[in-house]
Amino acid sequence: NAVMLGYNTDVEKDGGVALGADSVASVDKDIAGYDPSTKLASANTSAAWKATHAAVSVGNGSTATRQITGVAAGTNDTDAVNVAQLKAIAGGTGSIHFVSVKGGNASSVNYNNDGAKETGAIAIGANAEATANSAVAMGFNAQSNGSGSIVIGESSGLIPDASKRGASKGNSSIIIGTENVDKGGTKEHAGSNDGILGSNNTIQESNGAFVTGAFNHVSDSYQFGQLSASEQQKLAQAMADGKPLGKYIGKWGSHVFVTGDGNTVSQGMNVTISGSQNTVKNSKSQTVIGDSNKITDRNAGTVSGKQEERTKNVSDLVIGKGNDISGNDTYMKGYESLTVIGNNNKAVNPSSSIVIGDNQRLSAIEESVVIGSMTPEEKADPDIQQKHASVVVGYHAQSGTGAGGGMNVALGHGAKAYGWQETVTGIKSIVEAGDSGYDGYLASVYGGLNTVASNKADQNDGMANTVVGTLNKTEGANGALVFGAGNSVTHSFGTAPTDENGKSMDEYWSDAILVGQKYAMGEGPLGHDELRKAMGLAMSTGGGSVVTMGNGNTSDYAVHSQIIGSGNILTGTANTPSINNTINGYANTGRNVERMSMMGTGNNMSGSTADVVIGDYHHKDGGKNNVILGSMATEKKTVEKTYTMKDASGNVILEKKYKVTENVPIKSHTANISNAVMLGYNTDVEKDGGVA
């Protein structure tokens, strides 16, 4: 059945046709044609792809070849294609401009346009590979291994290990940029719904994370909760209605959003970062804006077990640079949030507070408001910390110490409240703390440069002191009330009664007063009336309870006494304090006196008991139960005095003599007189019981 037409022709297969001189027909029937889509012989067995008869040859393929001319364009699948048809195809591809792919060598993946492995997949670029349904990989070394995922960029990829790939891993993620990698992970939906835009970013064992920038890293931030039947029904209805789906997919994805450079998120959930070099680890519901902030273990385990409740209800907010927040309140209630705005603040196990400022050290802070800044040196001092349930406003202002304290108000530049439940309002005013938890307890200071000092020896030092004014001081005193400027109350403690067993009642009252800490937080067994009663009894008996009102008054070793005026002095001794005295006026002095009432100017009483003095310039030593009304004769004298200035260490740095003109009494009263009455100008009694 062969046809051989022409000189030196030959047919080597049955039914072959050789046309023209030197033609050889050597191709048999049943030979499949070349499929350009696969670059292999076609697997199609139809007559259009597989010949039913041996081939027709017009040459021998080497020394004899011929053009077939005058061929019209074919119509059917088995018709020949002419050059006109090929030109038309070339013209169609030539209409695409500015598209060029320059790859490596023939061994590169996708060299043979085979990088797209699954249905609907697209791979463009040398070594580009799309191995999942509808995946897109575009760029040199681009890898897209998740269904419906898009990877665009050099050496970027959604590339979970082949052994870990699954139907849900890496799905619907988008990566755009250079050398970005989403490694997926072992979890069912790891790598799904992620987004990366930038360069050198990494996501691993996470889902629902979105990263923009460079050199960011997100890991172990994964959530895929199951919807309830009701939620699934609502979601389906919302999808059918074309409504937003956000509120139905809160259980899906980590909701981690990172914008910036060099940020790290590990074990995060509902985390938003904007900035550079920030770190969030084992912490959920965090918003971080700024640079070099570090938040760790905000979701550490707790005794209360409410850390996940906190995640649902609130979010921490950190704005600034260099802030370091670690740990949480082990007894949290589930609604605590921390707001830090500033730079280089450090908080360990914080709860719910608001901090605005720089270089603050916060120790287990809870329900506090801190506005102001410390220096780096102050931050480095472990004794300078802000404590819980406090309001602190001002540069260098402080509530509590490293050893304890808290629940204070400190308002003003350098205001310090070191103890418990203190109120300090004023520039550089301070309530010191001692060795006892009672020191400075419930003290109140209003004004600048006041000090409620602790001598570190007396328990209850500074308790319930009230200071209003400026440059006043109390030390070794409790229950003191100071109003004015330049006043001093020192060594002022009372003696509380004892119970039937000889135990001081002050212990019972102090224990009750301390319950005020719980009362302030809405807890504890005692109400306000019981606390008030205990405080009243403690201060009226065991308290020093010295009241000074005016300027430049001094009380030392005096209790249960009152000074009103200016320049007055009331003193006693450690063994026998002056007690139950009243001084009203100017420049009066009482030394070692008891139950004395003095009103006037320039009086000086020493060692007297139950004397009443009304008038000016009475000087008397000893005696008791005297009544003096009137003024003594005086003369003006120039008196030389010395002003000595000392530094904080007690060293004399200045000493100046100066002179003043004063009224000086011409004579003093007879000493050690008792039961006398002196009525009128310049009177005196020389015998007990006398009346002048």
What residues fall within each predicted segment?
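Periodic small-residue-enriched repeat registers in elongated scaffold domains
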Residues: 1-43, 48-53, 92-692
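A sequence-level detector for low-complexity, Ser/Thr- and acidic-rich stretches
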Residues: 57-58
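Extracellular repetitive beta-rich solenoid segments
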Residues: 52, 62-89
